[in-house]
């Protein structure tokens, strides 16, 4: 995996600061399509994230002390559950194709259960998810 050491350094910083329930690499790197100019999309689920989205992004970006092009996105555990329930493409991609870097076992089971419910209502197409 490109930037492996940098990614793991970032993961450790996030774990110390935000006590996440889930950390997942998604996007091109998870699908094996990483190339020149690609970034490293990391989904972070933590109930310690601020409600304000701009403050949330600032914290997530400031935790990256590496040269890796990390593009973090962060959600609370309830926000992420709602995203899965509604068939949000980012959430579905992260669960379907993602590489789990860290997980709370109980939370991951909840997420997988929700995903199984939703996967019966959507279908994966070449460029995204569609309702069936």
Label every PLM stretch briefly.
Residues 43-45:
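Short hydrophobic/aromatic beta-strand micro-patches
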Residues 1-22, 30-36, 47-132:
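Catalytic core of pol beta-like nucleotidyltransferases
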Residues 38-40:
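A short beta-strand element within the Helicase C-terminal
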């Amino acid at each position: 995996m490109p930037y492996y050491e940098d990614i793991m350094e970032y993961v450790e910083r996030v774990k110390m600061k935000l006590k996440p329930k889930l950390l997942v690499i998604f996007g091109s790197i998870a699908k094996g399509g990483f190339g020149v100019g690609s970034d490293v999309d990391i989904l972070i689920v933590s109930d310690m994230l601020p409600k304000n989205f701009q403050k949330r992004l600032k914290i997530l970006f400031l935790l990256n002390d590496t040269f890796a092009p990390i593009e973090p996105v962060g959600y609370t555990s309830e926000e992420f559950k709602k995203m899965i329930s509604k068939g949000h493409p980012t959430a579905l991609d992260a669960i379907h194709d993602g590489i789990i870097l860290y997980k709370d076992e109980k939370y991951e089971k909840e997420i997988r259960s929700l995903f199984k419910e939703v996967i019966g209502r959507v279908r994966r197409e070449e460029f995204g998810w569609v309702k069936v």
